[in-house]
Amino acid sequence: NGAFVQKFRYGYTPCCMRIDRYLRYDAPNTLQVAIRGTNLPNSRWYSGQGIYRDAWILTGDYLHVAPDGLHVTTLDCDRELAVLEVKAELQNEGQRSREGYVKLTVHDGSGREVAGRKARFYVDSNGRVTVRQRIDLEKPALWNVDTPNLYSVDCQVIDRETEQAVDTAQTTFGIRKLQLDSVHGLRINGQSVKLKGGCVHHDNGLLG
């Protein structure tokens, strides 16, 4: 709508900015993202410029999972048991404190629910809090190069006052144990794996 919002100087990492204060809620809005690199060359050769990745408009409650704020870490795993840590970073951009609980649900590749946990939280106004939960998963389908089994975890943020979900987030993950040393090289779930690949960028191929 003609108002300057924010400048971001490095194009190879994501950025996130609030635009609600610049919106007109009773009329059409115009959102313009300008890419300007002519005054600051970024390569030793001529390369293309523009937006190469997805751009999203996020809407929701003042209390929400922060962008890219849901992560799963495999603490330990074998064919009998996987020990996972799910970390959800909650952000409260409102002017009052909030509390409630986070509901975590793990699904396997077929969509079947295989585990779940709940964890309470309290977050100050204009604050952040990280909720961590350990989840034990029996008989996991491990991820490897030949059978890249995947799971997903759904995160619901439940407000204490209304008992309603004010935000949801989901991420996909694989369960595997990585080891790297000078004797065996890279091992995935105890099996040696040879690294094969190339550095091919999105622009200018091998020179990108």
State where each predicted segment sits.
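Active-site-adjacent substrate/metal-binding segments within catalytic domains
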Residues: 1, 6-9, 16-18, 62-73, ...
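Short glycine/proline/serine/threonine-rich loop/turn segments at secondary-structure transition edges
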Residues: 23-28, 97, 137-152
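Accessory beta-strand-rich segments of carbohydrate-active enzymes
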Residues: 1-67, 93-94, 109
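Extracellular and select intracellular beta-sandwich modules with Ser/Thr-enriched
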Residues: 51, 114-117, 131, 165-170
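Beta-strand-rich binding/interaction modules
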Residues: 81-122, 129-133
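Short strand-edge motifs at loop-to-beta-strand transitions and within beta-strands
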Residues: 13-17, 127-135
